[in-house]
C-alpha cells in the first residue's frame, strides 16, 4: 500500500515509486513470457502495443492484488485495464522513445487514469532510464511534443531481489 506521503507525491508530481516489488520469480516469468512472444511474433521484439491480444498470460501481472490496491488508492476503486504494452529497451541499444504525453494517445476523457511501469532490469541514466517532467500532469495538455529537457528528471531504479 502507498503511504499518505506517496499519494501526495503522486498528486503533486505525477509519479510515485512504491516500496512494493514483484518477486524475482515473477520478473523471470515475465521475461520468459516475453521471449515466448518474440519467438511466436518476432515483429514484437521492441514493442507490442496490444499485449493482451497477443498473449493473455500477461493479464496475470496486471491482476497483481498489491498493484491493484495501489492503483485504487490513486484513481479510485473502479479500475479498468484498457491497454497493456510491452516496451523492450535493451540498455543503450534499445529504440528511443521521444518525449510525449501518454494522454495525447489515449482515448479517455476525462483523463482519469494512470500507468504502472514494471522495470525488468536495472535502469540508470547511462543506460536509458525512464524520464519525466514532474508536475506536468497538472498543466494543460501539450499539442506538440517538442520540450526543453532542462526540467526533466531521470528515474533510475535498481531491482530489489525478494
What are these regions (language model features)?
Residues 15-17, 115-119, 129:
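Conserved hydrophobic/aromatic beta-strand scaffold that supports enzyme active sites
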Residues 37, 77, 123-126, 139:
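Phosphate/oxyanion-binding loops and surfaces in catalytic or ligand/nucleic-acid-binding neighborhoods
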Residues 160-162:
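Conserved small/polar residues in nucleotide/adenosyl-binding loops
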Residues 85, 101, 118-122, 134:
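Short, structured patches in soluble enzyme cores that scaffold and shape functional sites
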Residues 107-125:
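Short, conserved beta-strand element in jelly-roll/cupin
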Residues 1-108, 144-145:
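Non-heme Fe(II)-dependent double-stranded beta-helix
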Residues 94, 125-158:
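Glycine-rich, pocket-lining loop/helix-strand segments that form or immediately flank
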Amino acid at each position: 500500500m502507498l503511504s499518505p506521503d506517496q499519494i501526495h507525491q503522486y498528486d503533486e508530481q505525477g509519479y510515485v515509486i512504491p516500496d512494493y516489488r514483484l518477486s524475482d520469480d515473477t520478473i523471470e516469468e515475465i521475461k520468459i513470457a516475453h521471449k515466448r512472444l518474440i519467438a511466436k511474433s518476432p515483429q514484437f521484439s521492441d514493442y507490442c502495443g496490444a499485449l493482451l491480444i497477443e498473449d493473455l498470460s500477461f493479464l496475470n501481472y496486471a491482476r497483481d492484488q498489491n498493484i491493484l490496491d495501489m492503483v485504487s488508492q490513486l484513481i479510485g476503486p473502479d479500475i479498468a485495464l484498457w491497454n497493456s504494452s510491452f516496451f523492450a529497451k535493451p540498455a543503450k541499444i534499445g529504440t528511443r522513445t521521444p518525449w510525449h504525453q501518454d494522454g495525447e494517445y489515449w482515448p479517455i476523457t476525462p483523463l482519469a487514469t494512470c500507468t504502472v511501469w514494471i522495470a525488468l532490469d536495472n535502469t540508470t541514466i547511462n543506460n536509458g532510464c525512464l524520464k519525466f517532467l514532474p508536475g506536468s500532469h497538472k498543466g494543460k495538455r501539450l499539442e506538440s511534443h517538442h520540450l526543453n529537457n532542462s526540467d526533466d528528471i531521470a528515474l533510475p531504479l535498481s531491482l530489489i531481489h525478494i
